[in-house]
Amino acid sequence: MTAFRAMTTQPSSGLKSLYNTCITSLINAGIWAKLDALYLMNVETAQAARLNLKNPGTYDLTATSSPTFTAKVGYKGDGSTAYLDTNFNPITASGPKFVQDNASAFVWSLQQTAENNPQLGQAGSGNTIIYGRRTTDTMQGQVNTTSTAAGAASTDGRGLIHANRAVSTTQELFKNGASVGTDAHASNAPISANLAFLRTSVLFSAATIAMGGFGGALTSQNAADLYTALSAFKTGVDAL
């Protein structure tokens, strides 16, 4: 796997096998080709956790203001300044899959409790934001819109939350591979600002996140297959 050459410390044999199985599953499901970035943060070293596995060296994460890394768990924000910058700006990126009416973003949160700060964000006109569980016991996600987010009831913020836009008029929210809500609001052009985990422009999350990524829109079957692949990776890492 190309990403292994970009890792300063090679993963254990067990983790290498899990990487290969996960990425092979995403390729076979037709998901890999649609991604701009995939980050598996619940691994053995912080440097490997920040790699964009789709294209190492491009859109690798920058840990800003010292989010806390825990091996085989992920990265935790502090609720005030710490976050992970994807270094991906949808306006200045070269040939991105993530575009106005064909885009998705996802994050695997390990935080059960509620907070009104998003686990993934890009604030301003053209918002792309994901909340695993707000204090209203709802989860929300929106992609390239300033309008109301797609939402659903949520009393547990843990799991894979995935916001998707395949057309100009509708966005959809998925939890653990299943559709949980749609929202019929028109898209806005993405803004010239980096996507980030654990923050928007002014709000910072204290959650722990294990995985994340973004790219073009995914089908419902893709969403289910993404969850299956990432869940298998997480289960495998938990057992190492």
Model-found features: residue ranges?
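Polar, enzyme-active/binding microenvironments
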Residues: 1-240
